[in-house]
Structure formats: C-alpha cells, structure tokens
A protein has these predicted regions:
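N-terminal cationic amphipathic segment used for targeting or macromolecule association
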Residues: 1-2, 47
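Sec-dependent N-terminal signal peptides
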Residues: 3-12
Length: 225
C-alpha cells in the first residue's frame, strides 16, 4: 500500500520542465510586424513554394527571426554605404546583412556557387540571374540588386533549403519541426558547418540573447499559415 504514495512523492521531486518562452510577448511590436509582413507577402513565398515543391510554412519560419531583427535595427543610410563598398571592393571589405531576410553577400555567393553543383542551379537561369557566382564588380552589383529584391531573396531562400536537403540527406528528422529547427540553425550559423557543429550551435542563445531555432519553431507552431 505504500508503493503508490512513494511513486507520487518521487514524481513531485522531479524537476519541472521549464515553461515555453513567449517570443510574441518578448519581441512585442517587432514580432507583430514580422507576422504581418509574412501575411502581406504570402503570395510571393507561396508561389515559389508551390513551383519548387517546398514547405512554405518552413520557409517563412526559417527567416522569421531575421524579420524581427530587420524591423528593430534597419538603418537605410548605413546599408547604402556598405552596398557601395561591397560592389567596389568585395565581401572582405563589406559583408553586411541586407533585405528583409538579412542575407549577406557572402551567403548569396555561397548559395550561388553550391546551387550550380545541383539540378536546382537551373532555377537561377530561369529567373534571369546574371553573373551568377562571379566575383567581379559587375557580378557584385548584380548580386546586390538581387539581395534588395524580395522575390529574389525568396529564391535564394528556396535554393538554400534545397542545398541543405542535399547536404544533410543522410540525417533522419523526427518531425517537420525538428527539420525546421536544424535548417533554421543552418541559416543562422551557416550551412557550411559540420552537422555536429550545427547541432551544438542549435542549443545556444546567441540571437538577440535568445535561441534562433526556438523562435522559428515558435512561429511555426503558433501562427496561422
């Protein structure tokens, strides 16, 4: 007769799971702005997702934290100055975040180069991209123009997703949310890292003092598509 009370006491002594962080409350108006931006641009993202058979909600969730940051830190004058420096001198002199998805020129260069090694490289040609993976002043100018265009940023995002699928095709994901958190970390930390490094990075709070992949998952699980 003592077994049941003993088990109950043992259960009470177990540490409670930490409560889920409410990122909507933490980021306030920046969170709301990011949600509204995605709703207003649903058509663009959904068009590409349908065209290339990609999960639209995951694409949105991957860049959602960057939209929060964009609304909080965007400085038009600084970005214009850095764009000029990148075009004239290259990524080693100016590797800045640009556009709603806060993509860096070095990221765009890497995506272009890696996509050319896969069948999805054809997507860039179909989109009319010029000077792809070319590190000349003309090539960098074209790249900046693409990064400043929302439709082209969405295409970069789609290419990134397919590159991650290819690179980590041997990894088994427990659920779409598990895959989302891994790919979101790839976006934040860099998909060029090893799988072990990405998994380690996924546990860290280094995005506005919070966890990038957790913010992505919060949007994915709590906001309507």
């Amino acid at each position: 007769m003592m077994a049941a009370p003993l088990i109950w006491l043992m259960m009470l002594s177990l540490p409670a799971s930490p409560p889920e962080i409410d990122y909507k409350k933490i980021f306030g108006s920046d969170y709301t702005w990011a949600v509204n931006w995605l709703k207003q641009n649903d058509a663009v993202i959904d068009d590409y997702a349908v065209k290339y058979q990609l999960p639209a909600k995951e694409l949105k969730a991957i860049v959602f934290p960057e939209l929060i940051r964009y609304n909080g830190v965007f400085n038009a004058l600084e970005v214009e100055s850095l764009k000029y420096l990148y075009v004239s001198e290259g990524k080693h002199y100016a590797n800045f975040s640009v556009g709603y998805f806060q993509m860096k020129p070095s990221f765009a260069e890497m995506v272009e180069s890696d996509a050319l090694q896969l069948p999805v490289g054809q997507w860039m040609k179909s989109a009319g991209w010029k000077d792809v993976s070319v590190d000349t002043e003309a090539g960098r100018r074209e790249r900046v123009l693409r990064l400043c265009n929302t439709r082209h940023q969405v295409l970069y995002l789609c290419l990134f997703y397919k590159i991650c699928e290819s690179k980590f095709q041997g990894r088994t994901f427990r659920s779409p949310t598990d895959r989302l958190k891994f790919f979101a970390t790839c976006y934040n930390a860099g998909y060029h890292l090893s799988e072990k490094s990405i998994l380690s990075f996924q546990t860290k709070n280094n995005f506005l003092q919070y966890n990038y992949s957790a913010i992505s998952a919060f949007y994915y699980l709590n906001e309507e598509d």
